[in-house]
A protein has these predicted regions:
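Short coil/linker segments at helix-helix boundaries
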Residues: 142, 170-201, 205
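Membrane-proximal, proline-rich intrinsically disordered regions
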Residues: 22-78, 257, 478-507
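Bacterial Sec-dependent N-terminal signal peptides
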Residues: 1-33
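Short, solvent-exposed loop/beta-turn-alpha elements that line the ligand-binding surface or hinge
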Residues: 89-114, 181-194, 285, 319, ...
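Flexible, polar/acidic helix-loop-strand segments at domain edges
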Residues: 177, 330-385
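Conserved, well-structured interaction surfaces
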Residues: 46, 50-51, 55, 59, ...
Length: 507
């Protein structure tokens, strides 16, 4: 839909005052009725009619995090693990094989869905953030309530924007709810529905600003409810944001990681299996609110996740949908890495073998599956302490503080019942950097981190361009990885709707 503005403006004028944002060819939010609590009484922002409406809108954000598993978790696993050396696509479908073969193009339908969903989530957060400003200005909400809800909304928005920044490099920065279009203002207002993509620095500055607001005003960390946007959640995300190339500041990574590590009630689970375990007697996950969880999404009987059966058997219903090839199949390269390390503790919680009726990548009678989401009742972790400890280790290594980095890595290895790093793994700066990256691979496999680790450390070409020689079971790589591979293509559907967007280089 190129030149959408020029080709539709006459029709919009004809619609006159009855034409609203809901009628646009491009819908910034999926349904305004979902996002606007109360009525729209001006042309500036959606109105939250009272405090109760604001509380409902905040609840909506948490429900999006919980229920929209496609872009909040599943597709990040595909990008993070299938697009790296951790996993194969698993099926022959176009949803996953392009990631395995480095052939993702702008027509990829799931990438298009993710772009639209992320913008929809940002729009929902903006309704809360802007609506709270109105309520606060009118004295309809207390100072404490205003800051607490505002902080949670901004953490949510920044989480969405950070995902977009890591996938596409940059995105259209939208912080306001668009005005209602009328015949009188259409030429001025219509372009605001189609903003250009901002530069990466601008995107990251807003992400940092939102997380810093959350760090100041969000609720304190609650050990008995780790599903909430808390100060510790904001600090953890800041540690990860400052590790990225655009703003890279290793001292700040250490600063915010230390805030997280020193949070009372936050510590590594003594047993790795507790994070992922299934209790067959109670037909439930082993534990919610695990001691190392910073932000998790929880599921219960009657309200389970569906994502588990995308990867393997869902243990609460053993044979459910186990009749088609599953996604994110563990790679030979990853399994070999675990085995070389002698890391049975984590391997056995990361990979499981079943008999199945397909043999896409392995013999059907001994087929490996991703095991970190093994039932519809297991937690999905958005942030956990081991990740932040290893982010700090990475930063210490790049700062030249090698012993500090080694100590942190050994802390993670100890929980996995592995010996401390051998002397050859700690002898040089590069050896320590390699050891941290390797430890992150084993600790965080199938948590959607590996691809982003390689991008952040600028090691994509090193690990991925020789992957077919290391891993004979992988589909052929169709294109070599290069400097343009670090960002995925902006979906063609988004470009068609918005002439102000420009495609990422190389696509």
């Amino acid at each position: 839909m190129n030149n959408i503005y020029s080709t539709t403006i006459a029709a919009l004028f004809a619609a006159s005052l009855t034409f609203t944002a809901c009628s646009l060819d491009y819908e910034p939010v999926s349904e305004l009725s979902e996002l606007t609590q109360g009525s729209q009484t001006d042309t500036t922002t959606a109105v939250l009619k009272d405090k109760s409406a604001a509380q409902d809108q905040l609840k909506t954000l948490y429900e999006k995090l919980r229920n929209r598993q496609e872009h909040w978790h599943m597709d990040l696993n595909v990008i993070g693990d299938v697009h790296s050396d951790n996993a194969y696509g698993g099926t022959t479908g176009a949803e996953v094989t392009p990631y395995e073969q480095n052939a993702v193009d702008p027509s990829h339908k799931n990438l298009s869905r993710d772009w639209d969903r992320y913008l929809d989530d940002i729009a929902a957060a903006n309704v809360l953030i802007n609506g709270l400003d109105q309520l606060h200005a009118k004295g309809q909400i207390s100072e404490t309530e205003y800051h607490s809800m505002q902080a949670q909304g901004k953490i949510f928005r920044a989480m969405v924007m950070f995902s977009m920044a890591r996938i596409w490099g940059a995105f259209p920065v939208i912080t306001k709810v668009a005005k209602t279009i009328t015949a009188a203002n259409i030429e001025k207002v219509y372009p605001t529905y189609f903003p250009p993509k901002s530069d990466a620095k601008t995107c990251y500055e807003l992400i940092v600003s939102d997380f810093k607001y959350g760090l100041k005003y969000a609720p304190d960390f609650n050990t008995s409810d780790r599903t909430r946007m808390s100060k510790t959640v904001a600090a953890a995300w800041l540690a990860k944001v400052y590790a990225e190339q655009t703003l890279q500041d290793y001292n700040k990574v250490v600063q915010y990681a230390d805030m997280v590590i020193n949070t009372p009630g936050l510590k590594l689970e003594p047993k790795f299996e507790t994070l992922w375990g299934w209790n067959d007697k109670t037909k439930d996950c082993v534990k919610r609110n695990t001691s190392e969880s910073i932000l998790e999404v929880q599921y219960f009987t009657g309200s389970t996740n569906w994502e588990s059966w995308m990867y393997g058997r869902s243990l609460e219903n053993y044979d459910f949908f186990f009749n088609w090839a599953k996604w994110v199949t563990p790679s030979r390269d990853l399994i070999a890495d675990f085995e070389r390390e002698g890391d049975t503790e984590r391997l056995n919680q990361t990979v499981v073998y079943y008999n199945c009726t397909w043999s896409n990548y392995y013999p059907a009678n001994h087929y490996p599956f991703m095991y970190k989401l093994r039932s519809g009742l297991n937690n999905v972790y958005k942030l956990r302490l081991a990740d932040i400890i290893l982010m700090k280790a990475e930063s210490e290594a790049y700062l030249g503080n090698l012993q500090q980095a080694v100590t942190l890595v050994n802390q993670i290895r100890h929980r996995a019942k592995l010996a401390p790093l051998a002397a050859d793994k700690t002898a040089t700066s590069q050896a320590v950097k390699d050891a941290v990256l390797h430890e992150r691979r084993l600790e965080l496999a199938f948590e959607g981190e590996r691809w982003f680790d390689l991008v952040r450390t600028k090691r994509v070409e090193e690990f991925m361009n020789g992957i077919n020689k290391r891993d004979k079971g992988r589909l052929p790589q169709l294109y070599p990885f290069n400097e343009y591979s670090y960002r995925l293509p902006i979906p063609q559907t988004a470009l068609d709707k918005n002439d102000n967007l420009k495609q990422n280089p190389g696509y």
